[in-house]
Amino acid sequence: RVLFRSMRGQSRDYDQWAELTGDAAWRWEHCLPAFRQHENHWRLDAANAAQASAEFKALHGHGGEWRVERQRLRWDILDAFAQAAQQAGIPATDDFNRGTNEGVGYFEVNQKDGWRWNTAKAFLRPTCYGRPNFELWTSAQATRVLTEKQADGSLRCTGVQVWTGEEMVTAHAQQEVILSAGAVNSPQILQLSGMGPAALLRQHGIDVRLDLPGVGANLQDHLQIRAVYKVQNVATLNTLANSLVGKAKIGLEYLLKRSGPMSMAPSQLGAFTRSRPDLPWPNIEYHVQPLSLEAFGEPLHDFPAFTASVCNLNPTSRGSVTIKNADFRSAPAIAPNYLSTPEDRQVAADSLRITRHIVAQPALARYRPEEYKPGPQYQSDEELARLAGDIATTIFHPVGTTRMGRVDDPLAEIG
């Protein structure tokens, strides 16, 4: 939930997991009850529930930990993009979480009364902070998991080595250790603990506890290709935030109403569609933003513009995460290998053409959109795939480096 959008996967994704693992518990119909149990959807509040359809009630929940609300801000430029997408053949939707994501509409968000709703607020504070068996260490870094070899040759995890910022301490496990440090830090911790590709571990002088070639391999990430269009005669965040008066208005609106740009998700409008008409399911996702910049961390442009980011939902490119030495303080080497397969390059080129097709629709004509990135002079597949890499960046969805799998999968860490 990096962008605090409330988003489930497509039912097809869960069904594929079940097929790949041989475990029917991953199927959509078996995951849906858990989604509903933990959801607290605004459309099922007492004031709104009468308007909710029976189909919606069967897909969503109320009273759970995760608050889901509609966004508290709309933009004319985003409304126009949504209309243009419909004119280009993408249907409208008011619910991306019904099992098929296809359509264009505003994302719903994990907020409560304009405040971001996160894991700490939803789970830790109400259920964990008062428990005698719960202790949270902050500003601490797990450096290694500790293991003992059993009589049958297997390894048993006995604890975790932790750097507190001042000293190294050991947390001993009485029952189990759950490693959940993300797609970058989980493989780093395992490799530092002697579990990973044997050649890599020996290269850095680490005792091989378990040769697991898959640890750190199979890195996958969503690459957002950020097409930027200059516009006229319409407000965007660029124009609002590039003046002291505009910044003051933004701050006051949030202070007084908990609405406005400070309450918004970075990407407010979304769309799921297909890069080719013969595909059975949507394979690309748009995040449309009423703003633009040269790169993350840089100032907004001083001209009005919007960004239509598009990403391949199922990339075939694979990367890796590997330690550079045996020091836990050293960041690992991350090689995402974006756009390294012909399929991913073709999807990238096709996605930029779909963006152009949407922007060329009548609904946006009044704002005179002008392609700023990648630039209308680039037309061939090769040019568009190359420029896609130049204007793209991670959308912070890395997965796959400590993957679960079937018992007979040699690259899985857990079978």
Residue locations for each model-derived region?
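A glycine-rich dinucleotide-binding beta-alpha-beta segment and adjacent secondary-structure elements
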Residues: Q111, W115, T138, T143-L146, ...
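Conserved redox-cofactor binding core of oxidoreductases
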Residues: V2, E19-K149, S154-C157, R226-G251, ...
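FAD cofactor-binding and catalytic pocket of flavoenzymes
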Residues: V228-A348, R386, I391-D408
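Periplasmic solute-binding protein
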Residues: F4-E19, G194
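N-terminal accessory segments
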Residues: L20, R27-E39, R43-A52, H60, ...
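Glycine-rich loop(s) and the adjacent beta-strand/alpha-helix scaffold that form part
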Residues: R27, A34, R144-E253, G260, ...
